[in-house]
Amino acid sequence: MPLALQRSTLEEFFKRTWARRGLAAWLLRPLSAVFGVLSALRRLCYRFGIAKAQRMRVPVIVVGNIFVGGTGKTPLTIWLAQTLRQAGFHPGVISRGYGASSDVPRAVTPDAQAREVGDEPLLIAHRTQCPVMVGRDRVAVAQALLAAHPQVDVIISDDGLQHYRLARDIEIMLFDGRGNGNGWLLPAGPLREPVSRRRDFTVINGSPEETAMPPDVIQMHLSGVMAEPLAATNLPLEDVPSRALRSFSAASTGFSPARILAAAGIGNPERFFAQLRAAGLQFDEMPLPDHYDFVDNPFAAVNADVILITEKDAVKCRQNDALRNDPRVWVVPVTAHLDDAFAEQIVEKLRGHSIA
């Protein structure tokens, strides 16, 4: 069995297990208890100074989740970086860079390969025009970012809630429509840490009725109302001519007689498919493993007139000649929308003395 298929089968098993407290989850519960104790001890070591957290010379904002898999961190990180730039800050972004080939800090340049720096950091760099650096050691990466870009006055860590060695000033925890799953810790459930874990802000990617979260959290909605040909997106997205864009209403009319395939190699493909259905499109679905590398062309034998992919997948597809030149492939960029009051709270915290 191919490795990607094995991974996909294992992912499906755990998705089913983590959705409810069934037999498989109960059998794994003792391991969750051990995991919970070890995780709590680690947090306490940093809280009481037994293990030392490294503080940067600028404030650090961590955007992350405790639910395994994708919850929409990248759109939120992009929104946050753009919001801070508009407020007069000079943000820089650090990330682990899933799939990155180097363990040492590495700058994400416009011509970087996704397999070298990771798909999400490459997308963040394209969308925000902020300095982005990746590496396994968040402290070393943050230090390298500040050394290379001394104008940076706030660091955004894309993921890394559990990387306690990097001291942080603001924590933003993100959930999506899956809520807490069955509410148990790994491996019986999908949670890396308890929901009661301390944080500054809780954001839900989706509607309140889709989650079991409390009502006082901050709502985030993703909108993708445009589609653009992959062949026209070799430049940074902000440089793509507006004539290359088509609204979903136009796409729906123009594509309705055709066979449409929607493909997504993200943590929660159903979120992408639901977004397209809400736009009135009818299509076949191709869920791919998270961070699918697109080294091979999964669409070569597909009988479809139009193939819709996520923006995160597009940064990898552009680096495959067959995919980049396939006129059937269209990209659906998404934009995060959050309440202005949330942006004001973040800016106020950064400008105040509470995180000095």
Swiss-Prot record:
UniProt binding sites for ATP: 67-74
Pathway assigned in UniProt: Glycolipid biosynthesis; lipid IV(A) biosynthesis; lipid IV(A) from (3R)-3-hydroxytetradecanoyl-[acyl-carrier-protein] and UDP-N-acetyl-alpha-D-glucosamine: step 6/6
Keyword Nucleotide-binding carried by entry: yes
A Pfam family this chain is assigned to: LpxK
Reactions this protein catalyses: a lipid A disaccharide + ATP = a lipid IVA + ADP + H(+)
GO biological process: lipid A biosynthetic process; lipopolysaccharide core region biosynthetic process
Cellular component GO terms, alphabetical: plasma membrane
EC number: 2.7.1.130
Family matches, as SUPFAM superfamilies: P-loop containing nucleoside triphosphate hydrolases
GO molecular function, a single term: tetraacyldisaccharide 4'-kinase activity
Keyword annotations: ATP-binding, Kinase, Lipid A biosynthesis, Lipid biosynthesis, Lipid metabolism, Nucleotide-binding, Transferase
Function recorded in the entry: Transfers the gamma-phosphate of ATP to the 4'-position of a tetraacyldisaccharide 1-phosphate intermediate (termed DS-1-P) to form tetraacyldisaccharide 1,4'-bis-phosphate (lipid IVA).
Family (UniProt): Belongs to the LpxK family.
Protein name (Swiss-Prot/TrEMBL): Tetraacyldisaccharide 4'-kinase
Source species: Herminiimonas arsenicoxydans
